[in-house]
Amino acid sequence: MWRYISKQAYSRKFRNSHDSALLGFSQYSSSFGKTRPLQCLCEESTTNPNLGLSQNSIFSRISRKVRHLEGICEESSKNPHLGLSQNSLFSSVKGDFRVCGKRGSGSLGFLRSYGSAAEAIASTSEEDIDEIQELIEEMNKENEALKTNLQPKQPKTIGGMGVGKYNLLRRRQIKVETEAWEEAAKEYQELLMDMCEQKLAPNLPYMKSLFLGWFEPLRDAIAAEQKLCDEGKNRGAYAPFFDQLPAEMMAVITMHKLMGLLMTGGGTGSARVVQAASHIGEAIEHEARIHRFLEKTKKSNALSGDLEDTPGDIMKERERVRKKVKILMKKQKLQQVRKIVKQQDDEKPWGQDNLVKVGCRLIQILMETAYIQPPNDQLDDCPPDIRPAFVHTLKTVETMKGSRRYGVIQCDPLVRKGLDKTARHMVIPYMPMLVPPQSWLGYDKGAYLFLPSYIMRTHGAKQQREAVKRVPKKQLEPVFQALDTLGNTKWRLNRKVLGIVDRIWASGGRLADLVDREDVPLPEEPDAEDEAQIRKWKWKVKGVKKENCERHSQRCDIELKLAVARKMKDEDGFYYPHNLDFRGRAYPMHPYLNHLGSDLCRGILEFAEGRPLGKSGLRWLKIHLANVYGGGVDKLSYEGRVAFSENHVEDIFDSAERPLEGKRWWLGAEDPFQCLATCINIAEALRSPSPETAISYMPIHQDGSCNGLQHYAALGRDTLGAAAVNLVAGDKPADVYSGIAARVLDIMKRDAAKDPANDPNVMRARLLINQVDRKLVKQTVMTSVYGVTYIGARDQIKRRLKERGVIEDDNELFAAACYAAKTTLTALGEMFEAARSIMSWLGDCAKIIAMENHPVRWTTPLGLPVVQPYRKLGRHLIKTSLQILTLQRETDKVMVKRQRTAFPPNFVHSLDGSHMMMTAIACKESGLSFAGVHDSYWTHASDVDQMNKILREKFVELYDAPILENLLESFQQSFPDLQFPPLPERGDFDLREVLESPYFFN
């Protein structure tokens, strides 16, 4: 019998030996040795119902069998005739067959592999063995089911997509962020080889061929410079930093960064040396950090020869780190990878001085190696006209304090001519992401996977940066949550609208507010020697050149936007990571194609997730069409806007189906591309069998009514101001600009009735009466929130009057603008008295603080600390290979006037940013897609009613708090020795009226 038992025990392999490890224990751990016998599990079941074991369970039944067998064991120790010793197989098995767990702990701590025990249990009969075997097999099934329930389930989707697709896109995203420059350099190397072998250069686009022609000599010159640095023959201060990247990557970064600046330089084809050097130096340092890390973590056999003498333990540690990084990369644990990169990179930051020195030297080498040759229309017997592509010159700029000179890099006119075709060949960093951004966890933890990402754009303001870093993370949770919500909104390209844009652009622009792709021809020089004619000609030439510069700048801007659109158009969707300015307003980190941009950007972007229109969605689409069509239609009641769209159904269908071949009704809109996108969406819905079930991807906008004044009216509980900016219900939206224009007209009519002999403004009033409308005063009313000055208002109104050409004499035009500006500001003060008093109070408090040489600080309702960055700038001179550069650095002295004038608008912007973020969080909790553009909130057509309810509730919640009282208290706590003015008097406006106002946002 015992031989049979032994045979049973040894004839089977132990199964499920890994079960214990899966649950956190190994059979060699200390916990394992202290486990209690199996019957403890059955005892547990009576006190721990979570285990799901009853007295009739398999565990209980087998426990009774085991107790029977244990009795045999005990008997064997007393009765040596049984032939079992304490060291026998059965004894050892008896000791191993255990389950651990604390009595009453509420959870199963460890499950031993019962298959292995079953194969070793002894019995007094074969029937016992068979019965136990059956029980064990049954129990193993229960064990597997229990383990499955205990193990954490892997998510089936991440970011709304399958795990496999997500991981694939994430790998692509990592490649985009870490290998962009390397891929560009590789492309140039391959093009050079192709050109040598197959003569492909003539087939390349113009700017691509220029880049290719500059690349090889620039790369070789950088390599030669690096060799001098290595040999110690170059004693330049930049030498230690010059060889940290391969020459080909430095060449590509230098070309692309400089050309990018030239493209965005206002159409002049020039870039300031200090700006260009800083941009190039920063890009080189960042890429060097990634390159250095990747080199460090290579396998030991790939390390360079100077590591042969490295001690073995260091080599092992490096190999360990490399393997760890590799595993983490496979698991997509990018946060841990970034942390390791930071820990392993023991290099100190280069510092601004060294950055600009490296940048200047690279620019200098590019200037020495990059040449351009005009097209082959020169005479055969003339030497070829080969000239430098870039030159370094000095520009003089006249300022109020005198003239200033600064160095610029100027490109040749032939290079400038090709700039607006360059975007498609540029490496554009901070592209929209293919996967949801990393959640924000700290000042520099979130958004992009590898690219440096900071939650706030501090622009070198140290105090603001430190203030954000010092705040407990818990305090910033609402801010993190709001930014994550904005970043997780998935977008895609509207390919139909993009196709129309491409057709218009390919045919020369000039439609739908797209700039003409051709320059205005310069006027011919007159033959006459008349000085007046020559002066007139020069004036015309100057105007044409200015116009062409503006066109060039707009062309570059459109090309950059379209370059991004073309790269992203085949993607199912993409995301815009967001961060904040110092006031707490949220912005997409990608700068070119985003929903904060122009009508072009907004027209070709849509939500990647579609939703059925539902009962209200089609109505909101019609309202949205009227809003983007504009021309006064957007000021009608909702019913009026719906009627406008329904009256233009034929135009809508024609625009959607034949946008360029038909009547082109959509081109008459103020926002033509958004109008076209809406026409297409409405046409699709109306053509479908059931419009309510038609899927819409279009974001519908709800915009505040002069939102800054809405916030001031709420702060001051101003009844009159609240009515002017739609905080109270009305039959149609109140138009604050028309309201101010009406007041201005009343004042001017009173003045016009006076005796001109006693008041010089009488004639000006009579002249301007017919010119007063909402357009004349709109910009001044809008900027009143930002503390517009009398001079600012005068210049704004002067521009409007000059456009109309009513007053030709410059002196009279200036005088009329002065009078109109004073009148407009008077009307504003009358209508928004509470806003004016709050602005004055905020400015007075700021002045008191700034006079003590302290910046103004406050904390937004969402817990974000704000420090105004306005300090006097000091000059710091750096000698570089190009020129002596003047770097500006903050001093300890604050700018009192700027601190005072900027505080009121900055404070209100921090409040509108808080309102937007509160709305974003609430929309996410309600399952809505949400995008925000400061005072414009977007969601699907079917969800507009719900979003409207949320944004009103959040506005009331925001201003139910004692905001001004809290601000004054924080000032008094920070500066107990200073005397602050009392809070301004406020009105009796009931905030809850906002909840019933249909046009608060509309």
UniProtKB/Swiss-Prot annotation:
A cellular-component GO term for this protein: mitochondrion
Keyword Transcription among record annotations: yes
InterPro entries per UniProt: DNA-dir_RNA_pol_helix_hairp_sf, DNA-dir_Rpol_C_phage-type, DNA-dir_Rpol_phage-type, DNA/RNA_pol_sf, RNA_POL_N_sf, RPOL_N
Catalytic activity: RNA(n) + a ribonucleoside 5'-triphosphate = RNA(n+1) + diphosphate
GO molecular function: DNA binding; DNA-directed RNA polymerase activity
Tissue expression profile of the protein: The highest levels of expression are detected in the mature leaves. The level of expression is lowest in the cotyledons.
Keywords: DNA-directed RNA polymerase, Mitochondrion, Nucleotidyltransferase, Transcription, Transferase, Transit peptide
Top-level lineage group: Eukaryota
Active site per database record: D703, K778, D935
Claim: Membrane is one of the keywords in the record: no
Transit peptide: 1-21
Enzyme class at the top of the EC tree: transferase
Locations listed in the record: Mitochondrion
Biological processes annotated in GO: mitochondrial transcription
EC numbers: 2.7.7.6
Protein's job: DNA-dependent RNA polymerase catalyzes the transcription of DNA into RNA using the four ribonucleoside triphosphates as substrates.
PANTHER family documented for this protein: DNA-DIRECTED RNA POLYMERASE 1B, MITOCHONDRIAL (PTHR10102:SF27), DNA-DIRECTED RNA POLYMERASE, MITOCHONDRIAL (PTHR10102)
Protein family according to the UniProt entry: Belongs to the phage and mitochondrial RNA polymerase family.
Name of the protein described by the UniProt record: DNA-directed RNA polymerase 1, mitochondrial
Lineage: Eukaryota, Viridiplantae, Streptophyta, Embryophyta, Tracheophyta
Gene assigned in the entry: RPOT1
